[in-house]
């Protein structure tokens, strides 16, 4: 997939057909129900399930003679579908929300509650921890750790031509914030709770609000921030 720029992401969201994806459980006389091909219909004699856009399903249900039905709604007027993750060569835990047109590298790990927006890229062997947010087009290199609750700002709103870019082998502690357009160099360490508003040089440790360089990465730093390949095995 070609890398999306800011305007392409905005245009994709603005111009996409908006849908309300639903799953509907049906009970009653179903033999006379006929749904369009765009709706996935699994119909038995007296019970069934249909999956599709509520705009297509609702008119049919209004005319049907049903004993009962129940609607599960996944979203309302959604502009970007979720990524089909079946083919991803990665560990993606339940509860992660990953939108379409996201690139996920081999052996990456995406934990529960992580939110990955359209156009983001996650390098091989990188872990996105619980509740972390990768905004639109955020780019994370190989073998990184993005801590729980961390936010990498996106390019959409406020608009930014340059995405957040995280180099390879970067460790970001919990609840850090990296603002739009910022580049974090290879091997850098960002302390928990830091707010990064400027580029971070490679192999440095930054901390604070706003984040400032407090030292160079040394043997002691590397020992404290070592990543575990065992957690990235599939």
From Swiss-Prot:
* Record keywords: Acyltransferase, Amino-acid biosynthesis, Diaminopimelate biosynthesis, Lysine biosynthesis, Repeat, Transferase
State its Enzyme Commission number(s).
2.3.1.89
Keyword Repeat in the entry? The reply is yes
User: Which EC class does it fall in?
Assistant: transferase
What's an example of a GO molecular-function annotation for this chain?
tetrahydrodipicolinate N-acetyltransferase activity
Report the pathway entry: Amino-acid biosynthesis; L-lysine biosynthesis via DAP pathway; LL-2,6-diaminopimelate from (S)-tetrahydrodipicolinate (acetylase route): step 1/3
Q: Which reaction does it catalyse?
A: (S)-2,3,4,5-tetrahydrodipicolinate + acetyl-CoA + H2O = L-2-acetamido-6-oxoheptanedioate + CoA
Q: SUPFAM superfamilies recorded for this chain?
A: Trimeric LpxA-like enzymes
Q: Which Pfam families match?
A: DapH_N (PF08503), Hexapep (PF00132), Hexapep_2 (PF14602)
The record, for NCBIfam families, names: DapD_Ac
Role of this protein? Catalyzes the transfer of an acetyl group from acetyl-CoA to tetrahydrodipicolinate.
The protein depicted here goes by the name 2,3,4,5-tetrahydropyridine-2,6-dicarboxylate N-acetyltransferase
Q: Where does this protein come from, organism-wise?
A: Lacticaseibacillus paracasei (strain ATCC 334 / BCRC 17002 / CCUG 31169 / CIP 107868 / KCTC 3260 / NRRL B-441)
